[in-house]
Amino acid sequence: MVERIEDLNLPNAVIGRLIKEALPESASVSKEARAAIARAASVFAIFVTSSSTALAHKQNHKTITAKDILQTLTELDFESFVPSLTQDLEVYRKVVKEKKESKASKKDSNTAENANASATATAEEAPE
Protein backbone atom coordinates (compact mmCIF):
# COMPACT_ATOMS: atom_id res chain seq x y z
CA MET A 1 0.00 0.00 0.00
CA VAL A 2 1.13 3.57 0.56
CA GLU A 3 4.24 4.00 2.69
CA ARG A 4 4.38 7.81 2.82
CA ILE A 5 1.72 10.48 2.49
CA GLU A 6 3.74 12.04 -0.36
CA ASP A 7 3.16 8.86 -2.39
CA LEU A 8 -0.45 9.95 -2.78
CA ASN A 9 0.44 13.14 -4.67
CA LEU A 10 -0.18 13.46 -8.38
CA PRO A 11 2.95 13.88 -10.54
CA ASN A 12 4.36 17.41 -10.43
CA ALA A 13 4.73 17.53 -14.22
CA VAL A 14 1.02 16.88 -14.66
CA ILE A 15 0.08 19.48 -12.07
CA GLY A 16 2.44 22.01 -13.65
CA ARG A 17 0.91 21.43 -17.10
CA LEU A 18 -2.63 21.80 -15.72
CA ILE A 19 -1.72 25.03 -13.93
CA LYS A 20 -0.07 26.39 -17.10
CA GLU A 21 -3.17 25.57 -19.19
CA ALA A 22 -5.55 27.13 -16.66
CA LEU A 23 -3.76 30.45 -16.14
CA PRO A 24 -2.77 33.24 -18.53
CA GLU A 25 0.80 33.10 -19.84
CA SER A 26 1.77 36.15 -17.79
CA ALA A 27 0.80 34.46 -14.51
CA SER A 28 3.43 32.83 -12.34
CA VAL A 29 2.90 30.33 -9.53
CA SER A 30 5.30 29.80 -6.63
CA LYS A 31 6.64 26.36 -5.70
CA GLU A 32 4.60 26.47 -2.50
CA ALA A 33 1.42 27.20 -4.45
CA ARG A 34 2.19 24.35 -6.88
CA ALA A 35 2.71 22.01 -3.93
CA ALA A 36 -0.56 23.13 -2.35
CA ILE A 37 -2.46 22.67 -5.62
CA ALA A 38 -0.90 19.23 -6.11
CA ARG A 39 -1.89 18.18 -2.61
CA ALA A 40 -5.43 19.56 -2.97
CA ALA A 41 -5.87 17.76 -6.31
CA SER A 42 -4.63 14.51 -4.77
CA VAL A 43 -6.94 14.82 -1.78
CA PHE A 44 -9.87 15.58 -4.09
CA ALA A 45 -9.10 12.55 -6.26
CA ILE A 46 -8.81 10.29 -3.21
CA PHE A 47 -12.04 11.69 -1.74
CA VAL A 48 -14.01 11.13 -4.96
CA THR A 49 -12.49 7.67 -5.42
CA SER A 50 -13.30 6.67 -1.85
CA SER A 51 -16.86 7.96 -2.14
CA SER A 52 -17.30 6.21 -5.50
CA THR A 53 -15.99 2.98 -4.01
CA ALA A 54 -18.59 3.22 -1.25
CA LEU A 55 -21.32 3.89 -3.83
CA ALA A 56 -20.24 0.93 -5.98
CA HIS A 57 -20.08 -1.29 -2.90
CA LYS A 58 -23.60 -0.19 -1.91
CA GLN A 59 -24.78 -1.23 -5.38
CA ASN A 60 -22.93 -4.57 -5.10
CA HIS A 61 -20.36 -3.64 -7.76
CA LYS A 62 -16.72 -4.56 -7.39
CA THR A 63 -15.52 -2.11 -10.01
CA ILE A 64 -15.96 1.67 -9.99
CA THR A 65 -17.42 2.91 -13.27
CA ALA A 66 -17.58 6.35 -14.85
CA LYS A 67 -21.26 6.37 -13.94
CA ASP A 68 -20.31 5.89 -10.26
CA ILE A 69 -17.86 8.80 -10.43
CA LEU A 70 -20.41 11.11 -12.05
CA GLN A 71 -23.10 10.12 -9.55
CA THR A 72 -20.67 10.65 -6.67
CA LEU A 73 -19.76 14.12 -7.92
CA THR A 74 -23.45 15.01 -7.99
CA GLU A 75 -23.98 13.67 -4.47
CA LEU A 76 -20.96 15.63 -3.22
CA ASP A 77 -22.36 18.89 -4.64
CA PHE A 78 -19.93 19.00 -7.56
CA GLU A 79 -22.71 18.60 -10.13
CA SER A 80 -21.32 21.56 -12.07
CA PHE A 81 -18.43 19.27 -13.09
CA VAL A 82 -20.70 16.57 -14.54
CA PRO A 83 -21.62 18.11 -17.95
CA SER A 84 -18.02 18.81 -18.99
CA LEU A 85 -16.80 15.47 -17.62
CA THR A 86 -19.60 13.66 -19.47
CA GLN A 87 -18.58 15.41 -22.68
CA ASP A 88 -14.89 14.55 -22.10
CA LEU A 89 -15.86 10.94 -21.38
CA GLU A 90 -17.74 10.72 -24.69
CA VAL A 91 -14.71 12.10 -26.55
CA TYR A 92 -12.44 9.63 -24.74
CA ARG A 93 -14.69 6.69 -25.59
CA LYS A 94 -14.83 7.80 -29.23
CA VAL A 95 -11.02 8.01 -29.44
CA VAL A 96 -10.62 4.58 -27.84
CA LYS A 97 -13.19 3.10 -30.23
CA GLU A 98 -11.46 4.65 -33.25
CA LYS A 99 -8.07 3.34 -32.11
CA LYS A 100 -9.52 -0.12 -31.62
CA GLU A 101 -11.16 -0.07 -35.05
CA SER A 102 -7.97 1.24 -36.65
CA LYS A 103 -5.94 -1.50 -35.00
CA ALA A 104 -8.44 -4.16 -36.12
CA SER A 105 -8.49 -2.72 -39.63
CA LYS A 106 -4.70 -2.71 -39.75
CA LYS A 107 -4.62 -6.30 -38.51
CA ASP A 108 -7.19 -7.36 -41.14
CA SER A 109 -5.27 -5.66 -43.94
CA ASN A 110 -2.01 -7.27 -42.77
CA THR A 111 -3.73 -10.66 -42.70
CA ALA A 112 -5.09 -10.09 -46.21
CA GLU A 113 -1.67 -8.97 -47.45
CA ASN A 114 -0.03 -12.03 -45.93
CA ALA A 115 -2.65 -14.28 -47.55
CA ASN A 116 -2.09 -12.61 -50.94
CA ALA A 117 1.68 -12.89 -50.58
CA SER A 118 1.35 -16.53 -49.59
CA ALA A 119 -0.94 -17.26 -52.55
CA THR A 120 1.45 -15.49 -54.92
CA ALA A 121 4.43 -17.41 -53.56
CA THR A 122 2.54 -20.70 -53.89
CA ALA A 123 1.57 -19.87 -57.47
CA GLU A 124 5.18 -19.02 -58.34
CA GLU A 125 6.44 -22.26 -56.83
CA ALA A 126 3.90 -24.42 -58.67
CA PRO A 127 5.39 -26.47 -61.51
CA GLU A 128 4.30 -25.54 -65.00
From Swiss-Prot:
Keywords: Nucleus. SUPFAM superfamilies: Histone-fold (SSF47113). Disulfide bonds: none annotated. It is found in: Nucleus. Residues 98-110 have a biased composition (Basic and acidic residues). Residues 98-128 are annotated as: Disordered. Residues 111-128 have a biased composition (Low complexity). Gene3D superfamilies: Histone, subunit A (1.10.20.10). One of its GO terms (biological process) is DNA-templated DNA replication. Pfam families: CBFD_NFYB_HMF (PF00808). GO terms for molecular function: chromatin DNA binding; protein heterodimerization activity. InterPro entries: CBFA_NFYB_domain, DNA_Pol-Epsilon_Subunit, Histone-fold. GO terms for cellular component: ATAC complex; CHRAC; epsilon DNA polymerase complex. Its main location: nucleus. Accessory component of the DNA polymerase epsilon complex. Participates in DNA repair and in chromosomal DNA replication. Histone-like protein which promotes nucleosome sliding of ATP-dependent nucleosome remodeling complexes. Part of the chromatin-accessibility complex (CHRAC) which uses energy/ATP to increase the general accessibility of DNA in chromatin. As a heterodimer with Chrac-16, binds DNA and facilitates nucleosome sliding by Acf. Has a role in DNA damage response by preventing cid mislocalization to chromatin. Homodimer. Component of the DNA polymerase epsilon complex consisting of four subunits: the catalytic subunit PolE1/DNApol-epsilon255 and the accessory subunits PolE2/DNApol-epsilon58, Chrac-14/DNApolE3 and PolE4. Component of the chromatin accessibility complex (CHRAC), composed of Chrac-14, Chrac-16, Acf and Iswi. Forms an heterodimer with Chrac-16. The Chrac-14/Chrac-16 heterodimer interacts with Acf (via N-terminus). Interacts directly with Iswi and this interaction is further stabilized by association with Chrac-16. This is DNA polymerase epsilon subunit 3. It comes from Drosophila melanogaster.
